[in-house]
Every structure is written in C-alpha cells, then in structure tokens.
C-alpha cells in the first residue's frame, strides 16, 4: 500500500480539481498517439490516424481520452486502494486487449506534459509534479499488476 503525505494528497487533489478531463484526456491521448506512433496499433478501429491533424480531430480518440480520465478519477477517489480499484482493468488490458504495459507509462507521461503545459510553473511546480508523478506511477503499477 502506498503512503500519501498530507502535502501529496493536497497537491494531487488540487491539480485534479483544476483539470478539465474533457480537454486534458483527448490532448494527452492524441499526444501519445503522435509522439509514440506504435501505440496506434491498439486503436485500429478508430479510423483515420494518418497525421497529427487527423488524430487530434478524431472523435473516437477524444472519447477514449475522456474515458481514460474517467478511469483516473476512480483512482483519485480510491487513492488508498488503487490496486484493487484497477484489478479488472488490469486483467482486461492484459488478457483481452494485450496492451504492452510500457504504454501506460507513456500515456501517463503525456498526461503530465499536458497538465504542465496547461498550468505552467504557477500551477504545476516541482512539488505538484512530484506528487502527481507518484500518483500516476501508482496507477501505472496497478494497471501492470496482471502482467507480473
């Protein structure tokens, strides 16, 4: 089980409270598909992913980005039990979708980049980043649990 300090909880919940999941989710998934094009193989049914403009304008990418952020909200609401919260999701991504677990870290990094761009130094300082990346590392670990 992960131990969260009061400062970490405050930073994570404070950042989450400012995030617009309808904005950050689509941006982060689009960024992941553009920067790491091999991740596109999991989204063959999403239609045109042939260029950055096509990816950024793709409604299925945007919808799945919002779904991802909805999943993160579950982790936010269950910060003391993320592994159990994500148990079924880990099984699905491992056994049904066969997603390479390294991709979870790549997407988490893209979420971090998008949040940092949105809020800049004033809203995403080193202390916030440290707590946020710890939180996302816990989420990634929980998603990878079935792979071990």
Swiss-Prot record:
Family: Belongs to the globin family.
Protein name, entry field: Hemoglobin subunit beta-1
Keywords assigned by UniProt, alphabetized: Heme, Iron, Metal-binding, Oxygen transport, Transport
Physiological role: Involved in oxygen transport from gills to the various peripheral tissues.
Listed GO MF terms: heme binding; metal ion binding; oxygen binding; oxygen carrier activity
GO biological process, one term: hydrogen peroxide catabolic process
Highest taxon listed in the record's lineage: Eukaryota
Subunit structure, interactors included: Heterotetramer of two alpha chains and two beta chains.
Organism: Danio rerio
Binding site for heme b: 64, 93
């Amino acid at each position: 089980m992960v131990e969260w300090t009061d400062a970490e909880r405050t930073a994570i919940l404070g950042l989450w409270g400012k995030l617009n999941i309808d904005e950050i989710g689509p941006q982060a998934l689009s960024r992941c598909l553009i920067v790491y094009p091999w991740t596109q193989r999991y989204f063959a049914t999403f239609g045109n992913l042939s260029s950055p403009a096509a990816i950024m304008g793709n409604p299925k990418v945007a919808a799945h980005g919002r779904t991802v952020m909805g999943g993160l909200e579950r982790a936010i609401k269950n910060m003391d039990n993320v592994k159990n919260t994500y148990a079924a999701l880990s099984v699905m991504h491992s056994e049904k979708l066969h997603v390479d677990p390294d991709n979870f870290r790549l997407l988490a990094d893209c979420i971090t980049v998008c949040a940092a761009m949105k809020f800049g130094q004033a809203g995403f300082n080193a202390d916030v980043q440290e707590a946020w990346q710890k939180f996302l590392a816990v989420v990634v670990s929980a998603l990878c649990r079935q792979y071990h």
